[in-house]
């Protein structure tokens, strides 16, 4: 860190690009007659990354290879190697199919929508968001729990297409090549195995409504959203080439898979029964079959529209520690950047990262719960820090996470804990 003192303004050095002084930045790098600060270096790196990403998308007639897709996914998503491989191939084939359709009319290639099955906080949403970013296509997310059949209180299925159109700045052609991610898809499972005589408007009814847009139809979308009115002019959007990715935690599906796999085992005193607890849900999900999803409550036609199944594993302590520190947008890096804005270094010990990961596992929230744990740990520090002078570094140890101890504050001239400086 380049922090030189001295009150003489003549000796103060400035960044040649943003004009900040050496006292306002962490590092000032000297070149022949010019200086550049660490913030401008980061900005340049971001610009280069974006340009290299766009050149990746433009290569090979606009379709990145599965290996190229996987490489970018690795930068943002830790672990889940099987799911990343399945998604990379499926997405590559989908956009290759679109290019094929415009050039060859002899063989029609069917669309392969994707089902993501994995525990809460395992990275389903992040995978879908990252895919859209790689391919530079419009992307929208929908929550299946808010959807109802047309004519009932709730959100129409066709509103999903409206959101995609908005993401494409109302460019219909771009929207027709976009990606839709529908979360909590397991929550619209049929309420019982047997079809009911009463209308299931938020379960089977939504599955039926989604079928039409997933297989390909021309949706009439009201430009300003909401319910349709006879006087409105509608935008016509063909959903044939829109890639649908559905994700869900499918709580209890592991038990259905386990009971099926043990269906042929013997009974009695000599029977060897492996307890379900020996295998985690993520491991069992790898063995999922369409019949398991049918038993869970998805209708056969809906399962048929999602031929590509990608399963995600539970995240263990090692994976959660990696998620905290390693990706380009890792949580630790985000909080370090926030502290940098106060000219303070944030140091989190390796043991503290492990303690944070264990807390997330105990809460059964996966990676999704990491931010709330970090917020709780750093809340008092972030509240006090703007009003403190002379703090150069804040150190988070394992005791801060596990025993609610106070973080260590390192001042320019002394060391003290948060309590001593409050």
UniProtKB/Swiss-Prot annotation:
Family matches, as SUPFAM superfamilies: Glucocorticoid receptor-like (DNA-binding domain), P-loop containing nucleoside triphosphate hydrolases
Residues annotated to bind Zn(2+): 15, 18, 37, 40
InterPro entries noted in UniProt: AAA+_ATPase, ATP-dep_Clp_protease_ClpX, ATPase_AAA_core, Clp_ATPase_C, Clp_protease_ATP-bd_su_ClpX, ClpX_bact, P-loop_NTPase, Znf_CppX_C4
Domain ClpX-type ZB: 3-56
Signal peptide: none
Pfam family, one: AAA_2
Keywords linked to the UniProt accession: ATP-binding, Chaperone, Metal-binding, Nucleotide-binding, Zinc
Superkingdom of the source species: Bacteria
Gene Ontology annotations of biological process type: cell division; proteolysis involved in protein catabolic process
Cellular component per GO, a single term: HslUV protease complex
Any one GO MF annotation of this record: unfolded protein binding
HAMAP family for this protein: ClpX (MF_00175)
Family: Belongs to the ClpX chaperone family.
Subunit details: Component of the ClpX-ClpP complex. Forms a hexameric ring that, in the presence of ATP, binds to fourteen ClpP subunits assembled into a disk-like structure with a central cavity, resembling the structure of eukaryotic proteasomes.
Function: ATP-dependent specificity component of the Clp protease. It directs the protease to specific substrates. Can perform chaperone functions in the absence of ClpP.
Name of the protein in its database record: ATP-dependent Clp protease ATP-binding subunit ClpX
